[in-house]
UniProtKB/Swiss-Prot annotation:
This is Uncharacterized protein C12orf60. Residues 162-183 are annotated as: Disordered. The lineage of its organism: Eukaryota, Metazoa, Chordata, Craniata, Vertebrata. It comes from the Eukaryota. Residues 162-174 have a biased composition (Basic and acidic residues). It comes from Homo sapiens (Human). Pfam families: DUF4533 (PF15047). Coiled coil: none annotated.
Length: 245
């Protein structure tokens, strides 16, 4: 086999592993975001459950469902805020307490209660910023057009749990567990068949090119989710500190 063919085969193997770990990372990040969102918005959205025998189509559909549920909650809460602004609610609440009592401790307690709920509009602002949820839905819809939806996660890569238990994701990517030659050949063949293009003279290269494109498209989605989580956590922390004073 030529060095070029070997290089293309290695590219396909590496792209398949990267896809596998991207899916795992996405599931983890989305569940973190979902938990944070549910607590902040006083709602309940089911977390993702991804297994090695999960179909890629089911995984992306779960993601889309979560984003749509979040958007629905955000839209409903945003409409409510538009009708009765937070500033008015704060002013009215504080004026009411002042009128009823001049007790400093009572005023302090009232302020804490106001700030406890003040982070909700911040969550809405973060998710509405640059149409994050809409952009994520659009990116996922684009990814679902690729011909890998009927594959299972294990078709891309299979971890040796015992061998990998104490290894980080990045280390796993660099140092994969020893796979049998038969399994490797089966994986390559399956990916080549699914990702092949018409009249391709080099199916391995074509498959590697397309899978690398898919992995590249997943990167920004993961980055957006991580930034959204960081921003939400930071803003919630600020308001928590304010409410504790």
């Amino acid at each position: 086999m030529s060095s070029e063919s070997e290089k293309d085969k290695e590219r396909l193997i590496q792209a398949a592993k990267m896809f596998f770990f991207h899916v795992q990372d996405l599931a983890s990040v989305i569940n973190t975001l979902t938990e944070l969102f549910s607590r902040s918005m006083n709602t309940q959205i089911l977390l993702m459950a991804v297994k090695n025998n999960s179909y890629i189509k089911d995984f992306f559909e779960q993601m889309l469902k979560i984003f749509k549920e979040m958007q629905s909650v955000v839209d409903a809460r945003h409409d409510k805020i538009q009708k009765e602004s937070l500033c008015s609610k704060v002013a009215m609440a504080m004026c009411s307490v002042v009128q009823k009592s001049t007790n400093v401790e009572e005023l302090h307690q009232s302020a804490k209660e106001v700030f406890k709920s003040a982070h909700t509009p911040v969550i809405i602002s973060v998710l509405n910023s640059s149409n994050i949820l809409g952009s994520l839905e659009s990116s996922l819809s684009h990814l679902m057009k690729f011909p890998i939806m009927n594959l299972q996660l294990s078709d891309f890569y299979t971890e040796d749990t015992k061998e990998q238990s104490d290894v980080t994701t990045s280390e796993r990517t660099r140092s994969p567990p020893g796979s049998s030659k038969t399994t490797m050949i089966d994986t390559l063949k399956k990916l080549q068949d699914v990702l092949k293009t018409e009249d391709s003279k080099n199916p391995t290269k074509s498959a590697a090119d397309l899978l690398e494109q898919i992995v590249k498209a997943m990167g920004p989605i993961l980055e957006i989710l991580q930034k959204a989580i960081k921003t939400m956590e930071m803003n919630i922390s600020v308001f928590k500190k304010a409410s504790d004073k």
